[in-house]
């Protein structure tokens, strides 16, 4: 189970962690893994705002005298002591064995002792150091871990209007996204999305609406309804000459757990309009029929499996239904969803599970069972762009990494542009989506 010791240049000779700041100004953990030949792999853990109840534990200090209780000195100490001691002199290329060693060292199901943030920062830094030691780009190293021979560039889910937990506004649905599916390359898709983002700003300004941005770089205006967010995006698409439903499709992240109260889905921004499970499912079905929506994430509460079953039966053959809080990147929970025919896609956030190896397990379990995979950032991000390499190296097909502003989001898009220039990787566009293939 434990990584074997090695005397070669790929031996781990030091591990160092520190507190850094994420895109919300909160502390997170960054780790360096240093090899015998001086090679350094560096990675940082992201942090979420709306989180699933079954996510692996993000260890925070709880000391109100520092960073309002959000410090991560305990996680840093765990890396600099226990994890460092356990991994010294191990072969950095033994990713699975190293991840298994950290899981065993923690000894809990949800990584409660060491913290998933501590373990993840080291797991990703190990992969980066290993890739450098073999003179491989990170995406190729990740591909080689699971013998992924064909690489693809992901379709970006671009979050251009923020609501819910990601913005201080009246919009209940957390993310309104565009998917540029009608293009032949990632770079052209990115250009189209960027043009629509700027067009949306002018549409909002012309209507006297706020153009400040939320956590993930999307605009955060106060709107009269969730549907109004869709209509202003449709205007922005048309204004720059693209066709909604052909060049560009729409996607929603409801983050429904955040407005699920006492068995009801309550839209506070629409006068506390209330729905039961079937009623809210029907509301989403109606939106998907009226507008070119090809993906709905967390359309229902993470515990409302009957509701998920109903929604999947209604539109699961036409619309991508993505489980985020529902599956929390956990292979065991995903398998339960597969068995019960719940949803048809999974959002992949590696800090929900805590190691690169377990993340890959979830991705390939989904692929094996015909579920789409969407690699995702968190609302609290850093300049770390590992998810870009993960998306290409696993041929995931889709990536969700925010809007077209804020350097913490753009860093991932820029890394994808670099990768596209380096490798032969197709951009599959419409073929990635259940309702658009053929």
From Swiss-Prot:
Disulfide bridge positions per record: none
GO cellular component: cell surface; extracellular region; phosphopyruvate hydratase complex
Entry annotation: catalytic residues: 216 (proton donor), 349 (proton acceptor)
GO annotation, biological process: glycolytic process
Cofactors required: Mg(2+)
Sorted UniProt keywords: Cytoplasm, Glycolysis, Lyase, Magnesium, Metal-binding, Secreted
Pathway connected to this protein: Carbohydrate degradation; glycolysis; pyruvate from D-glyceraldehyde 3-phosphate: step 4/5
CDD domains: enolase
Protein family (similarity comment): Belongs to the enolase family.
Protein name in UniProt: Enolase
Higher taxonomy: Bacteria, Pseudomonadati, Pseudomonadota, Gammaproteobacteria, Moraxellales
């Amino acid at each position: 189970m434990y990584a074997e010791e090695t005397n070669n240049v790929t031996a781990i000779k030091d591990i160092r962690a520190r507190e850094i700041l994420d895109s919300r100004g909160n502390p997170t953990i960054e780790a360096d893994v240093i090899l015998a030949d001086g090679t350094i792999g560096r990675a940082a853990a992201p942090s979420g705002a709306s989180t699933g109840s079954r996510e692996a534990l993000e260890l925070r200090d709880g000391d109100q005298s520092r960073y309002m209780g959000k410090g991560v000195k305990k996680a840093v100490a765990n890396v600099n002591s226990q994890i460092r001691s356990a991994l010294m002199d191990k072969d950095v290329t033994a990713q699975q064995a190293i991840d298994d060693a950290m899981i065993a060292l923690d000894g809990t199901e949800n990584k409660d002792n060491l913290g998933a943030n501590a373990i993840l920062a080291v797991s990703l830094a190990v992969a980066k150091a290993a890739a450098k030691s073999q003179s491989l780009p990170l995406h190729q190293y990740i591909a080689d871990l699971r013998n992924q021979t064909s690489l693809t560039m992901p379709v970006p889910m671009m979050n251009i209007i923020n609501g819910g937990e990601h913005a201080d506004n009246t919009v209940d649905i957390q993310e309104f996204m565009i998917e540029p599916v009608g293009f032949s390359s990632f770079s052209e898709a990115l250009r189209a999305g960027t043009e629509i983002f700027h067009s949306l700003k002018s549409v909002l300004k012309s209507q006297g609406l706020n153009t400040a941005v939320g956590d993930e770089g999307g605009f955060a205006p106060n709107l009269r309804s969730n549907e109004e967010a869709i209509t202003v995006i449709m205007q922005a698409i048309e204004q720059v000459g693209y066709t909604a439903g052909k060049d560009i499709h729409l996607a929603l992240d409801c983050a429904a757990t955040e407005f699920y109260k006492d068995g009801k889905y309550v839209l506070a921004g629409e006068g506390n309009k209330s729905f039961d499970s079937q009623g809210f499912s029907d509301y989403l079905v109606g939106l998907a029929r009226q507008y070119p929506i090809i993906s709905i994430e967390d359309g229902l509460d993470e515990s409302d499996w009957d509701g998920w079953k109903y929604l999947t039966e209604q539109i699961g053959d036409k619309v991508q239904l993505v489980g985020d809080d529902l599956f929390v990147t956990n292979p065991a929970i995903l398998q339960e969803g597969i068995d019960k025919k719940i949803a048809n896609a999974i959002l992949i956030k590696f800090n929900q599970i805590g190691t690169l190896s377990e993340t890959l397990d979830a991705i390939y379990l989904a692929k094996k069972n015909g579920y789409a995979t969407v690699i995702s950032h968190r609302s609290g991000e850093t300049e770390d762009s590992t998810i870009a390499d993960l998306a290409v190296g696993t041929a995931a097909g889709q990536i969700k990494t925010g809007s077209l502003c804020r350097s913490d989001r753009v860093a991932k898009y820029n890394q994808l542009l670099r990768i596209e220039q380096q490798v032969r990787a197709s951009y599959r566009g419409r073929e990635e989506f259940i309702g658009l293939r053929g």
